């Protein structure tokens, strides 16, 4: 995985609570097991007026011209709730998002996000309210999310956030479960050499 230390990007506000995984990526688009190609179906039922995805909904925030290219999603509480599907962070990252900021996340979605190099940032309800107001007042505003120092820089204000130290380490160093295992490759090889022949 790519290393994540700091990200600066355009912010798009999704002012809705309890956004579930079926809204993020509807079930009819889950046939693939690769991580790419899901971005075109992100928030399909909200982004489009037709089932074929040919008629964009002009009222949906992601379809607003000034949010084109957004890479930071600002959301409300309990983001990513509903059924467990890793396709949800796949769709978000494939669309171009690197960070989701919200007061809270569903547990499974939260874990899946780290596994797919999507940074979920938890801030308080009051802080998220401030950020929504800021985005509304300053069209096209960008935030800087500094994972190393655990802070969101928005305009002139800094918002510290907490994150598990192990997950932070993995994202900063671009480590998934395979990468973590390979860090101990020499020890694993040495261990295998010392096992009885009938175990090999």
Curated annotation (Swiss-Prot):
Q: Which InterPro entries match?
A: 3-IsopropMal_deHydase_ssu, Aconitase/3IPM_dehydase_swvl, AconitaseA/IPMdHydase_ssu_swvl, IPMI_Swivel, LeuD
Any one Gene Ontology BP term:
L-leucine biosynthetic process
Enzyme Commission number(s) of this protein? 4.2.1.33
GO cellular component, alphabetical, reads: 3-isopropylmalate dehydratase complex
Ranges annotated as spanning the membrane: none
**UniProt keyword annotation of Signal present:** no
**One Pfam family matching this protein:** Aconitase_C
Q: Which reaction does it catalyse?
A: (2R,3S)-3-isopropylmalate = (2S)-2-isopropylmalate
Question: Which GO MF terms does the UniProt record name?
Answer: 3-isopropylmalate dehydratase activity
Tell me the domain of life. Bacteria
Known pathway: Amino-acid biosynthesis; L-leucine biosynthesis; L-leucine from 3-methyl-2-oxobutanoate: step 2/4
Task: Specify the enzyme's EC class, one word.
Answer: lyase
* Keyword Lyase carried by entry: yes
Keywords, A to Z, come to: Amino-acid biosynthesis, Branched-chain amino acid biosynthesis, Leucine biosynthesis, Lyase
PANTHER family per UniProt? 3-ISOPROPYLMALATE DEHYDRATASE SMALL SUBUNIT (PTHR43345:SF5), 3-ISOPROPYLMALATE DEHYDRATASE SMALL SUBUNIT 2-RELATED-RELATED (PTHR43345)
Q: Which family does it belong to?
A: Belongs to the LeuD family. LeuD type 1 subfamily.
Task: Quote the subunit structure annotation.
Answer: Heterodimer of LeuC and LeuD.
The free-text function statement in the UniProt record for this protein reads: Catalyzes the isomerization between 2-isopropylmalate and 3-isopropylmalate, via the formation of 2-isopropylmaleate.
Name listed for the protein in its UniProt record: 3-isopropylmalate dehydratase small subunit
Gene name for this UniProt entry: leuD
